[in-house]
Amino acid sequence: MAQAPTVIVTQPGFVRAPQNSNWQTSLCDCFSDCGVCLCGTFCFTCLGCQVAADMNECCLCGTTVAMRTLYRTRYGIPGSICDDYMVTLFCPVCSVCQLKRDINRRRAMNAF
């Protein structure tokens, strides 16, 4: 018995690449949001969990290279995994504070 040929009726959709953008604040721009800076300085773990929750991720990865890389690629922010590794290694508090400030600003612009 002959089999009928398989016909594909759906085509792959168009995926829009994220447009290039930059960080909303610099790495050491603590005074643009003192609340985030104080939270990161005195309760680093809490801020990391807030960032992870904002991104719908596990709270254990809020301060990792993977979280920063995911965020950077999601919003088309230039950089590399090596850059992300160096920032999170040598300045973890500044890294998480920058992520939180960026999330807050993008949320205020309805872009998060």
From Swiss-Prot:
Q: What is the lineage of its organism?
A: Eukaryota, Metazoa, Chordata, Craniata, Vertebrata
Which BP terms does GO give this entry? Answer: brown fat cell differentiation; defense response to bacterium; negative regulation of apoptotic process; negative regulation of multicellular organism growth; positive regulation of cell population proliferation; positive regulation of cold-induced thermogenesis; positive regulation of transcription by RNA polymerase II; response to cold
Q: Name the source's superkingdom.
A: Eukaryota
Under the heading InterPro entries, the entry gives: PLAC_motif_containing
Q: Which PANTHER family match?
A: DUF614 FAMILY PROTEIN-RELATED
Q: Which GO terms describe its molecular function?
A: chromatin binding
Name a single GO cellular component: nucleoplasm
- State the protein's name: Placenta-specific gene 8 protein
What organism, scientifically named, is this protein from?
A: Mus musculus (Mouse)
Q: Tell me the protein family, please.
A: Belongs to the cornifelin family.
Membrane-spanning ranges: none
